[in-house]
Amino acid sequence: MNKESFFLIFSAFGVFPVALAYGAFPSFSLPLLYNIEITSNNLSNVFRAIMGLYVAFNIFWVIGALNFSLRLSALWSLFIFYTGAGAGRVLSIVLDGSPDMIFILYLSLEIFGSAISFWLITVSYTHLTLPTIYSV
């Protein structure tokens, strides 16, 4: 297995439990893990939607790890996922203050994951060029 496929699968296995923690049983897991009380069905719906996005990304990353033609797209989606989640956490720290340590750990992993995924994209796929759309 090459390093790109390994990192895609490694990330999927790391993110999947977080997805389940957010959405499988939010009224049980969120108070226990994150000190977040679910006070309405709307809040459960939001966390289950987040779970759905995380699971969908996980599926795509595993497919990309197994299918060369989708690997670069899967790496880009991994980079966007880590960068977007990390940027949101940084924004929250700036606007809301420091969260519990588990979210600082998540931020550290997102920064690391973003850097590794971008490195894999640039090192492994710099030989590829965009097709010429117009010929003169």
Residue ranges and their predicted role:
Residues V15-N41, N45, M51:
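Hydrophobic transmembrane helix segments
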Residues N42-I63, I80-G84:
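Core segments of alpha-helical transmembrane spans in multipass integral membrane proteins
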Residues M1-G14:
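Cytosolic juxtamembrane helix and N-cap/initiation of the first transmembrane helix
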Residues H127-V136:
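Single conserved hydrophobic/aromatic residue that forms the stacking wall/gate
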Residues A87-F103:
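Membrane-helix boundary connector in multi-pass membrane proteins
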Residues P17-V18, F81-V90:
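Aromatic-anchored segments of alpha-helical transmembrane domains
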Residues I59-A74:
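Juxtamembrane helix-break-helix junctions at the cytosolic face
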Residues G113-L128:
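Membrane-water interface at the C-terminal end of transmembrane alpha helices
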